[in-house]
Amino acid sequence: MNAPAEQADDVCTLPLVRRMAALLDRDPASFADGDLLPRGWHVALFNPPTRQSELRADGAAHLGVTLPDLGLPRLMMGGRRIEFVSDIPIGARVRRTSRAGAVTHKSGRSGRFALVDVEHRINLHDNATPVVIETNSYILREADGGQPAAESMTAPAAIPPADAIQILVPDETMLFRYSAITDNPHRIHYDLAYAQTEGYPTLVVNGTVPTMFLLEMFRAHVGGEPAGWRGRNLAPILCGAPLTLTLGREGDEWTMRAHGPRGEVALEARAWQ
């Protein structure tokens, strides 16, 4: 797939930053114009104003690039890689250039699916040098039969010791606020009846939500900001189910995980400075 690059412009506004701070239980008043945006919070920017008539059947909006219609209506993010080259000042005008990579078709136990990477390069409006380079990996799947997913029958897994541990219970208000901040209309995050048609027993937590809290753990326990992040979503994270967030050092990197209620790893990431 050799689709042309697509560009979008935005402004890193103070009210938007303060709403993200409130979601993460930080003091919104501690942020002011000219401060540096905490790394990772750029996810609140560049949410394309997709026309209602152009939303996918699952509610998913434009991803920053135009993807071909592959006949695969279910969308999920498989992972993301981020290089933080520099920082975005609050109040700055920013531009994002997005490109889609090749589409890889595969098949497995769940049927036919496709993988596609979308690369985003963000720069300040008066400087062509990127401040953030991000690659998001998406999985497109066939429609589900509509039967609720069965609970895992695997034995509970022990959560290994870590330098920092935090319990997070994503609830409906957290999902609503995150979707509002990021203008995310993907229905599995707020429409229970629709989520069940995709085989989920309840609402699905956007994988970026625990990512944001893991980045907060990194700042609190490591000190300073990360230079890079590499994460994989390994299992659905369900609304109301407790997550155990862990952080531990491994060599020059820090490993972070979100463990589900049975100890299973739902999200795994590495960050470095």
How does the language model describe each region?
Residues M1-A5, L75-P170, N233, I237-G240, ...:
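HotDog/MaoC-like acyl-thioester-processing domains
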Residues M1-L36, E151-P210, M217-A220:
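A contiguous, surface-exposed recognition patch within enzymatic or periplasmic domains that forms
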Residues M1-R93:
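Hydrophobic, proline/glycine-rich low-complexity stretches
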Residues P15, D27, G40, A44-P49, ...:
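Surface-exposed loop/turn and secondary-structure junction residues enriched for glycine/proline
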Residues A21-L24, E54-R56, A60-L63, R74-G78, ...:
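A short linear-motif detector with a strong N-terminal bias
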Residues W41-A44, P73-L75, I82, F113, ...:
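Flexible, active-site-adjacent loop/turn segments at secondary-structure boundaries
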Residues E54-G64, I82, Y138-R141, A155, ...:
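Phosphate-binding glycine-rich loops and adjacent basic patches that engage nucleotide phosphates
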Residues H189, A193-D252, M256-A266:
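Catalytic-pocket segment enriched in acidic/His residues
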